[in-house]
Amino acid sequence: LFLCNSGAEANENALKLASFTTGRERVLAMHGAFHGRTSLAVAVTDNPAIQAPVNRTDKVTFTPLNDIEAMRTELRSGAYAAVIVEGIQGVSGIRVASDDFLRAVREECDATGTMMILDEVQSGYGRSGRFFSHQWAGVRPDIISMAKGIGNGFPVGAIMISPAIPARTGMLGTTFGGSHLACAAAIAVADVMKSENLVENARVMGEKIVAAIKDVSGVSDIRGRGLMIGVDLAVPQAEFRKVLMSHHHIMTGYSGKNTLRLLPPLMIGDREVERFAKAFRATA
């Protein structure tokens, strides 16, 4: 385990570690990916608008999420240090990496000596109804990056590293990562998640939200896992969100012109689900 401060820093170190370990310099990332705004993290983010000229590189290739053949074609070149993939893409609208795709990535990484990096910064720490979203597929990545939920708002990031990857003194470093206060916050969060069974609660409440709104007129698609849900609307999301906020005091995220992103607290219960469903139906 390597402790740091943020998701971007976690992904920077995950990618750096993969390159150190394999001696290779290329990275395979997914269309729609978001991994952070710093040097390597933004280079593997599929958004040229937030890449400064200094961040742009020819060492990253993007293939479509869940396209097994495209992934295999790239990795079989033997040039890649790592594949980095979000278990559930958040910024691009809650796009779930399929179980079959993640299993195929694991198989191909094993065959080609490539590191499998799972970015669980947003989809981890119970949000999907499992502690990590990739656990739905039953795979074991080489490196897992995480942040956000670790400190429940306090800046804590980390990467979990396979014991098969050799450690070397000085290979990774951080100024503030793993401070006493950060660790105290992380331990407190873990204690509450365990005592209140919040991972299972996320799964159950997520299923209830989906069941409550999936047949509402104007919903064209709904997807996700646990309390990480994307809702495609037949109308622009901006006006829909404005009404939810001004009339019902409910805030949601969004992606693109028509997608709501629902990421409520893991501790919500039936009362909050019913309140949201009632407001959603009234707004639709």
Language-model regions: role of each:
Residues 1-284:
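Conserved N-terminal phosphate-binding loop of PLP-dependent enzymes in the Aspartate aminotransferase
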